[in-house]
Amino acid sequence: MARTPWLPNAYPPARRSDHVDIYKSALRGDVRVQDPYQWLEEYTDETDKWTTAQEVFTRTYLDKNPDLPRLEKAFQACNDYPKSYAPYLHDDNRWYWYYNSGLEPQTALYRSKDSSLPDLSTADGSGGDLFFDPNALSNDGTAALSTYAFSDCGKYFAYGISFSGSDFVTIYVRLTDSPLTKDVDAKNDKGRLPEEIKFVKFSSIGWTPDSKGFFYQRYPDTSTVTQENGPIATEGDLDAMVYYHRLGTPQSEDTLIYQDKEHRDWMFSIDVTDDGNYLLLYILKDSSRQNLLWIAAFDPANLGPNIKWQKVFDEYHSEYEIITNKGSLFYVRTNESAPQYRVITVDIAKGNEINELIPETDAYLSSITSVNKGYFALVYKRNVKDEVYVYSHAGNQLARLAEDFVGAAHVSGREKHSSFFVELNGFTSPGTIGRYKFTDPEEQRWSIYRTTKLNGLNTEDFEASQVWYESKDGTSIPMFIVRHKSTKFDGTAPVIQYGYGGFSISIDPFFSATILTFLQKYGVVFALPNIRGGGEFGEDWHLAGCREKKGNCFDDFIAATQYLVKNKYAAPDKVTINGGSNGGLLVSACVNRAPEGTFGCAVADVGVHDLLKFHKFTIGKAWTSDYGNPDDPNDFDFIFPISPLQNIPKDKVFPPMLLLTADHDDRVVPMHSFKLAAELQYSLPHNPNPLLIRIDKKAGHGAGKSTQQKIKESADKWGFVAQSLGLVWKDSTEQPNL
């Protein structure tokens, strides 16, 4: 199709105030920074009118795309296939697993009729009975199951529900013999207990061994908690507390276990060891890979603020994760003196004596699970490709599983069980579940339990490869490239380039029927550079993209585009960059930083665009470990020059740009996208390409979105790319060029 016509200088107006913030700079003293759209940080009638006008304006442009209806229909069709996830045997001796028949708004929790392993290879893939259906909680699919935990006795099911994508969760409890389905009358739900635990955020649910109650993290009782149909809470997250809730009592009687009034922005996680003998308290000050770890003997008669904690690791310099324990001997995954991670033991009965069990290797130890009362299932990441191994508790390697698989692996298992499952996914692999059963003969222990079958999409028509390229400073960066086999690498193909690069998060090969369909329909190539700042190669790789080195992330991403064009994977003017959250920052910063004409289009999802104020909202203070603290004069000097909002060049042409946010995003609050959109439209009113913002309703940062919301958003987002670049819909019957 032809590019959608664009008339510059027609944006909805936004009032510019004379608001100025003063920051301290180590190099320049007081620095005055104008913030004319500071008023967009608050939910007022003026903000509502501006966002409504922007929604109408953007919708008008998107709806001019003649391909939009069939693109949405194609995305709906390609996602309409049964999706099952690895089953998990709980203490009621029944198997539980997530299942979605295809287009249900939220994935539901199913369970087996008895202790027999369910058959998930049946035609519909459900393999059992519906146990918990989040779709019964709302008419529009915006209530989501965020977390859950079964009691050790198997009688109770505690579950956290979030509404409209908020990070805030309310915990409820129901009897496991009373499933929640759409047939249950919500007003007369006899299976749900009176429990209603509010103000919960970033929390697990940790049942005590006696099944009389559970631990959780909450924030103070305030009126600013994000509500389902109201404005979001934007204040900074302060005063987290760990509580114990006893079943049958009101939340007001819950017992405070721990809080730190001197460090109001610290967060906590509490758990009980599998043997029921110890409490584990993790204390985090930010998003870095560092935490404190305290351990205490579990005493049901002494659950309160006077618990005597043994401060096993009490300095912030490394990450410590308990894998399992044998009495007082604890097995720990850590990056202490090991950027790629290793396994150590610490004996708390012997003065916290430490010994190395599994040394650091040249691959990143991304996860380790204790299984079968004496074994570990490890996932190593080597060049962004997962490898799964079985080790003994003595630290000896026994087997490698699925050696020919290229992609990402996730292990699901428990120490008390004689088998575990591995979920395998890749760019052209929609989902395979393997099972390792210790009780079988050694050569028969590994088998394929379930393979996902698609409807209307042949993954054999696509191929994925990995290349390496040099960044600006000479660092070698890996990049995956995916294409439909009919798409040629001759310098004419449009490319979607996706990135993240932050918080030690590895962006592994993943399956997306939506992306593959877009590649097929428009002859597009998908590229994923694994830039610095992520966790693909351990902690050193992460730190190479943090704080004063954050610019490395942007340089890596820009160099990826230049490599794609130079080597004819991409047409010079048709590379679209995309990323979400920290990846949204990546997109807006790179558009500012790259030479004019580097990108053909840019799409930034829920991005962190105001690096001078991110730390003042919700969980933002925790991100200072990656971004730096704008209130620190030394940090300000490396943050200010890269913050997208304050560094829009007014003398260069911007590519078509779409910012996406949501009205209930209380992780990266929407003010980031609001202010950047307003500033872009003011600073570049005559830009020959559109600079738009899409604002989702009753949605948050991403988690909990309904299937329908995801499909609609994908159609708008990728449709914007197609209409902005003038992409042509290909005949779907075209045969691959083998």
From Swiss-Prot:
Active-site residues per Swiss-Prot or TrEMBL entry: S581, D665, H701
Enzyme Commission number(s): 3.4.21.26
Classification via Gene3D superfamilies: alpha/beta hydrolase, Prolyl oligopeptidase, N-terminal domain
GO BP term (any one): proteolysis
Highest rank taxon of the organism: Eukaryota
GO MF annotations, alphabetized: oligopeptidase activity; serine-type endopeptidase activity
Catalytic activity: Hydrolysis of Pro-|-Xaa >> Ala-|-Xaa in oligopeptides
GO cellular component, one term: cytosol
Keywords: Hydrolase, Protease, Serine protease
Quaternary structure and partners: Monomer.
Family: Belongs to the peptidase S9A family.
Protein name: Prolyl oligopeptidase A
Species, as recorded: Galerina marginata (strain CBS 339.88)
Source lineage: Eukaryota, Fungi, Dikarya, Basidiomycota, Agaricomycotina
